[in-house]
Amino acid sequence: MTDLDTLERDLLAQVGAASDEAALDAVRVAALGKKGSVSDLLKTLGSMTPEERKERGPLINGLRDRVQGAVTARKTELAEAALEARLASERVDVTLPVREAPEVRGRIHPISQVIDEITAIFADMGFAVAEGPDIETDELNFTALNFPPGHPAREMHDTFFLAPDRDGKRKVLRTHTSPVQVRTMRAQTPPIRVIIPGRTYRHDSDQTHTPMFHQVEGLVIDTSANIANLKWVLEEFCKAFFEVDGVKMRFRPSFFPFTEPSAEVDIQCSRKGGEIRFGEGDDWLEILGCGMVHPNVLRNCGLDPDAVQGFAFGVGIDRIAMLKYGMPDLRPFFEADVRWLDHYGFRPLDVPSLVGGLTA
């Protein structure tokens, strides 16, 4: 065994025996520092003959590289071991309740909470979430959805139009989230199963209407989607959202340009002492609109109505939030009143889950 082999064996043994980074650094300095054993060998290369340097140079440089590699590897091992030890000693008991400090406590807005509740319900049924821009083209907001040129929704008194562009075309603040249905059908191939929550805009302002409001729509496109499937989806949603064991629903024939046939859906309820309860009583309350996707809409999205079909539905998020949580006026939703939010808002850790009930 040569002197280099002996030195390498000793140095690697010292590296492996280093129990912490301080000890390892001491070994590194003793071997590779300015006055280290390997550094001293490198200095001898200058006094060697060319033949000796050609023979000894690669051996000494190889020794240096192997020692440096061993030091780096050992440093990584020690760092990982130190991290594991620290994590084990600093483990947090996540079962402990969160300490609340009322003076700094924030609240989740009811709209955000209800959107999360709706998302949890439909995710359990296999729906994905789709989103789109608030500013839309006339084509996506109206034409592709089978709105005729003279439809009242295209008038200034019902829709917010932006200034015309260079071509004289005007974009709009979307009046519904339906343009995202068009975008989805054009971008994806069936089967499609999505919900589309988001902001929408219309000229309207009173106790139950605001110029900006929130809506969630659902879209299912498949080869065999039918009204029976639509009815089941809506019943399951209403039971889960209002947290009742059963609901009675009635479908009233209606008209929407983008669905055929179309229906408005009422849900059974009772009104007692100013409180609305669902799943009981002899009264009815309109809750949403729905229908089978119109063949013209499928064609406008590049789909063959003879090969696929589907259904869609739309629910006002603000409205069902008011109904579920007993909020009499829609306008405070958007007034940024911290007192109102402290009363109607939700704690940050009130994450909706179907396991223990949405509001458990």
From Swiss-Prot:
**Where in the cell is the protein located?**
Cytoplasm
What cofactors does this protein use?
Mg(2+)
Q: How is the cofactor bound?
A: Binds 2 magnesium ions per tetramer.
Q: Which GO terms describe its cellular component?
A: cytoplasm
Molecular functions per Gene Ontology: ATP binding; magnesium ion binding; phenylalanine-tRNA ligase activity; tRNA binding
List, alphabetically, the InterPro entries matched: aa-tRNA-synth_II, aa-tRNA-synth_II/BPL/LPL, Phe-tRNA-synth_IIc_asu, Phe-tRNA_ligase_II_N, Phe_tRNA_ligase_alpha1_bac, Phenylalanyl-tRNA_Synthase, tRNA-bd_arm
EC number(s) from the headed UniProt entry: 6.1.1.20
Q: Tell me if Transmembrane is a UniProt keyword of this record.
A: no
Q: Which family does it belong to?
A: Belongs to the class-II aminoacyl-tRNA synthetase family. Phe-tRNA synthetase alpha subunit type 1 subfamily.
How does this chain assemble? Tetramer of two alpha and two beta subunits.
Record-given protein name: Phenylalanine--tRNA ligase alpha subunit
Species, as recorded: Methylobacterium radiotolerans (strain ATCC 27329 / DSM 1819 / JCM 2831 / NBRC 15690 / NCIMB 10815 / 0-1)
